[in-house]
Swiss-Prot record:
The chain crosses the membrane at residues 9-29, 34-54, 66-86, 88-108. Belongs to the UPF0060 family. It is a multi-pass membrane protein. Keywords: Cell inner membrane, Cell membrane, Membrane, Transmembrane, Transmembrane helix. It comes from the Bacteria. This is UPF0060 membrane protein Bcenmc03_1254.
Amino acid sequence: MTELMRIAALFAATALAEIVGCYLPWLVLKGGRSAWLLVPAALSLALFAWLLTLHPSAAGRTYAAYGGVYIAVALIWLRVVDGVALTRWDVAGAALALGGMAVIALQPRA
């Protein structure tokens, strides 16, 4: 697996853990679902925090690069879970964000 693919997969898993951890409380607060959903939400957010520690860069650089992948994963969530069709602007924005992530994550190491 190339370095970019490994980093992208780790970022995608991190983003999914964060989105699930935030979506479940949203279901409780906005959708009237059981408060028991807060338990897996907390576990998902703990997983998110742990996954962030697996990234090889300094925390600030990791968060900056992670933002690009988060945008793409959130748009996939929008399409798959929320059932909202993506626009060309959504796709273009995600492509730009992923390009920025690649520049930050794959910069030459001194």
